[in-house]
Amino acid sequence: MQERVLVGLSLGVDSLATALLLKAEPFSVVGVYFHLHQEAKDLEKVRKICKDNNIEFHYVNLQEEFYKDVIIPFADFYLKGLTPNICSYCNAEFKIEKLLQYAEKFSCNYIATGHYARKNDSLIGIAKDSWKDQSFMLYRLSEKQREKLLLPLGQKMKDEVKDFVRQCGYEEIANKKESFGLCFTNGKHYSEFLLEKYPELKKLENGKVFNKNNQEIGTHKGYPFYTIGQYKGLNCEGKQYINKIIAEENAIFVGEKSECYFSTLRLNSLVFSQNIENIELNTQYLTKIRGKDEGSFATLREISSNHSIIEFSQRVFAPMQGQDVVVYDENNFILFGGRIESFS
């Protein structure tokens, strides 16, 4: 009897390739379309693809839960003066967790997604296609989530995936322009999205901008709309780069671009993929501070269950409080990750 795998489906090339690859292995593939936000404009097309390929299909409306469990926390991060990587949060706390819940409901042995990341037992690592690598946004997954997760695209290049989907007869989907940015903002900048949801943020206009001598040199539109390293959108003379944000005072501090480089990061909210006892202090590890970052080596100075301190040999540009950092072992599998608490 074939094992059943639940695949989260959209009309994207990656999720479609995932379902078709697993069906060819063979698994008994079950497709689920999670309606998370806005209109479910691709629903009927996804349903037809499943019917044409003899894939069991389910539709689940999760709009209310997604708003409560993802969009509100997303806004809360910014209101605290933090810069979230909401995709890693959403994957662990919502999407993968919901897939597991519905896998049990639909009697599936595994779940699968179209993320580009390698898998070895319960470890997740950098994809073969390093440019498309999405391991960064999966670092917060629990061991239970990782054990049940299949990642069939981890050993494939993006062009291979597109060619496979074309060969399966879905030229239009293979040629579809890739979407970037947040899935729930409908192409809008996050600041515009926040203002729509929280119009009271207009009250933060005319916040003060200070230089390194604490002199007031201009104004800004409100601290939630800015991040470290940003220079656009400030009402002050010259090209000034943000190097500090004090949310409680609605205050922003600026200076030269060189003042936005830092070498030491303190992390909190740690999630471990490997045993902490096997992680060595004063050792250099490949470290990513952004999803599309190729990574650079940082030395681990402190580690506990609650916090970590890492030091880069070359300073990194614009680390931000709340931002994720992921640390990899010598084989490019995730050791642990966390959120930036402070930097210096």
Predicted regions and their residues:
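AMP-forming adenylation/ATP pyrophosphatase catalytic core
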Residues: 2, 112-118, 124-344
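ATP-dependent adenylation/nucleotidyltransferase module used to activate substrates
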Residues: 1-139, 159-160, 166, 242, ...
